[in-house]
Regions:
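N-terminal hydrophobic/helix-forming segments and targeting peptides
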Residues: 1-437
Length: 437
């Protein structure tokens, strides 16, 4: 991937692979290992070498990679995204109502519920399996349609097209076929283990459609999980293009879990993953408290999470002064309530970097009468206390089972992030940047 041209096909493979947060993390770690990054389990003692390339995971659903400074620590580059997407969490393996095989589910994140009806679905996640020496995790995702969530026919709900209020406990429960059979047995066979050795599991429903180009000229693409795996992959690609020419700068790329439900878990942005890794790096280098503060001031963190493009059928939902066009470039996200971390100061630095890369920038802001959503940047900021900027890419149908985005924008993000990782960034004094442009 390093020194290779950005490829939409590789992005599509990443989107297709990321059927659960555990699978997204596995896909990312496979890329990192292919690029020579060494796994450092959190439970092990770390021996870190100057200029070394490493990664660690937490809960199997969050991953952080870094390049060690070659000299005395002077600053940081970092990009953060998330591994999870709205879906349905399976509460138990299997029930029967006398006619259908079922599995109880509950909503994970703020999905568009109707988009999940009448699609072939599979099950994805991890099994916790008893072994001779303890417990192991096994990823599973059978490559076949295991379930569907059947719609209520129009004849039984004449008002269905006039605005249906869905009850997830009633309307969104999937069926897994007729009587007989066992979901646990199917997943055990998939994992190559005995069903009785499965002690527990973290499982979700996943769509089976593959990422595909769309449009008369193939300028758009459709996929599940574009939010936020598009940003995860493009920032990872940019991170891997970093040349590491600055002796004292450390580079970080991180993909957190549980953003869609508030980021408050141990593996989420409000957890201590990044803070813990920073502390261990600094300790291994013998960094003083003063050096640590200076290095964290000479930093700029990218919080990368997609935003809403102006909808062609509902332009009135977007800020009229700042329309977002798919294919129009990377989003710079602002919010007066600080749900986005971008300030004029950090926005200026990122804009300058994008100009150098030849990447267009669009301003994303909500209407003044719409509170909008939030993301992981302001939550991560509580842990690491570094200057930050919220960025993303415009897309349609966010939180649908299938979303739509721009091919050109994906390449813009990759180019911008690659330029960012190769641009020296320093604050000679408060309110001023010195950029190696």
């Amino acid at each position: 991937m390093k020194n290779a041209a950005f490829s939409m096909e590789e992005l599509f493979r990443f989107l297709d692979a990321g059927v659960s947060a555990f699978h997204s993390t596995a896909a990312a770690t496979a890329i990192l290992e292919a690029e020579g990054y060494v796994n450092c389990p959190e439970s092990a003692a770390w021996e870190l070498a100057p200029g070394g390339k490493y990664y660690t995971t937490r809960n199997g659903s969050a991953v952080l990679a870094w390049r060690m400074p070659k000299g005395e620590l002077t600053g940081w580059h970092a990009a953060a995204s998330h591994s999870d997407s709205p879906t349905w969490r399976i509460k138990q393996f299997h029930t029967e109502d006398g006619v259908f095989a079922k599995a109880e589910v509950e909503g994970y994140g703020g999905m568009i519920m109707p988009s999940w009806f009448d699609r072939p679905l599979t099950v994805a996640g991890r099994l916790l399996v008893r072994t001779g020496s303890g417990i192991e995790s096994r990823l599973v995702c059978p490559d076949r349609a295991l379930a569907c969530i059947p719609n209520l026919c129009i004849h039984f709900s004449r008002d269905l097209n006039n605005g249906m209020k869905y009850n997830p406990q009633v309307d969104l429960q999937p069926i897994f076929g007729g009587k007989g059979g066992s979901l646990k047995d199917v997943l055990a066979e998939e994992a190559g283990v005995k069903a009785e050795d499965i002690l527990d599991a973290d499982l979700v429903l996943a769509t089976r459609e593959k990422a595909v180009r769309m449009g008369l000229n193939g300028e758009y693409f459709m996929s599940g999980r574009i939010d936020d795996l598009e940003c995860a992959y493009t920032t990872l690609w940019g991170f891997l293009q970093g040349r590491g020419e600055e002796e004292g700068r450390g580079d970080i790329w991180v993909m957190f879990d549980n953003e869609e439900v508030g980021s408050s878990s141990r593996q989420g942005a409000q957890g201590t993953l990044m803070a813990d890794v920073l502390a261990r790096i600094e300790e291994s280098m013998g960094v003083s408290r003063e050096q640590s503060i200076r290095a964290r001031t000479n930093a700029l963190v990218l919080s990368a999470d997609n935003g809403h493009a102006t909808h062609p059928n509902h332009p009135e939902k977007s800020d009229p002064a700042n329309p977002v066009v798919m294919g129009g470039g990377v989003l710079l996200k602002y919010n007066a309530r600080q749900t986005y971390t971008t300030s004029g100061f950090t926005g200026a630095a990122f804009t300058a970097i994008c100009k150098k890369a030849g990447v267009p920038v669009q301003v994303f802001a909500n209407r003044a009468d719409v509170p909008g959503g939030s993301t992981l940047g302001n939550l991560l900021g509580h842990q690491i206390l570094m200057p930050m900027v919220d960025i993303g890419l415009g897309q349609l149908a966010m939180h649908s089972a299938m979303e739509t985005a721009s091919c050109a924008d994906a390449e813009y993000m990759a180019k911008a992030v690659a330029e960012y990782y190769n641009t020296p960034i320093f604050q000679p004094k408060d309110g001023e940047w010195k950029l190696g442009l």
